[in-house]
């Protein structure tokens, strides 16, 4: 049977429990028509690149499906009817990816970075202070400003 990756986006105001119920409902439709879901990943509430149906965020869910094309037509029909689903996309693939998807690997990598703690120094490296702030950076205090010589000559030429 053909293999599919199916991603759907649920509304931002839907709770996590409602999203899980949607997922089990879709899984039930797939299994009822002779297909099977090999993997389910909930990517959580994520920001959208642009607004869709007045939503700035959405719950993302990935389903790896092994089933006939009738399964895909039926779940897409069900999702068109359902108001909680903002968007969906089904792609036929040659084989399913083993292990976590790229989105889950990215989330794991971000979590590992958070464990490192706050970074010291930022992008300026070890350049202590800044020149336009108190302390003057490496230059230190420059002392009082010395008078300009050309200021005296400019005033004399105007007279």
Curated annotation (Swiss-Prot):
GO BP terms: translation
GO cellular component: cytosolic small ribosomal subunit
Keyword GTP-binding (UniProt): no
Sorted UniProt keywords: Ribonucleoprotein, Ribosomal protein, RNA-binding, rRNA-binding
InterPro entries (UniProt xref): Ribosomal_bS6, Ribosomal_bS6_sf, Ribosomal_S6_plastid/chlpt, Transl_elong_EF1B/ribsomal_bS6
Pfam families to which the protein is assigned, alphabetical: Ribosomal_S6
One function term, GO molecular function aspect: structural constituent of ribosome
Domain of life, per lineage: Bacteria
Gene3D superfamilies on file: 3.30.70.60
Record has Nucleus as a keyword: no
Biased composition (Basic and acidic residues): 93-151
Region (Disordered): 93-159
Function: Binds together with bS18 to 16S ribosomal RNA.
Protein family membership: Belongs to the bacterial ribosomal protein bS6 family.
Protein name: Small ribosomal subunit protein bS6
Species of provenance: Rhodopseudomonas palustris (strain HaA2)
Gene name of the record: rpsF
């Amino acid at each position: 049977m053909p293999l599919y990756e199916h991603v759907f986006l649920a509304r931002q105001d839907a709770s996590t429990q409602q999203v899980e119920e949607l997922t089990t409902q879709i899984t039930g439709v797939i299994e009822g028509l002779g297909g099977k879901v090999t993997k389910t990943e909930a990517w959580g509430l994520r920001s959208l690149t642009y607004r869709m149906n007045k939503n700035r965020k959405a719950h993302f869910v990935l389903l790896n499906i092994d089933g006939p094309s009738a399964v895909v037509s039926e779940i897409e029909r069900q999702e068109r009817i359902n108001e909680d689903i903002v968007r969906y996309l089904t792609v036929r693939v040659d084989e399913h990816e083993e292990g976590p998807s790229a989105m889950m690997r990215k989330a794991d990598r971000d979590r590992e970075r958070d464990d490192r703690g706050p970074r010291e120094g930022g992008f300026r490296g070890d350049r202590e202070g800044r020149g336009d702030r108190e302390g003057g950076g490496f230059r230190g205090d420059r002392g009082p400003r010395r008078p300009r010589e050309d200021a005296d000559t400019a005033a004399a030429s105007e007279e």
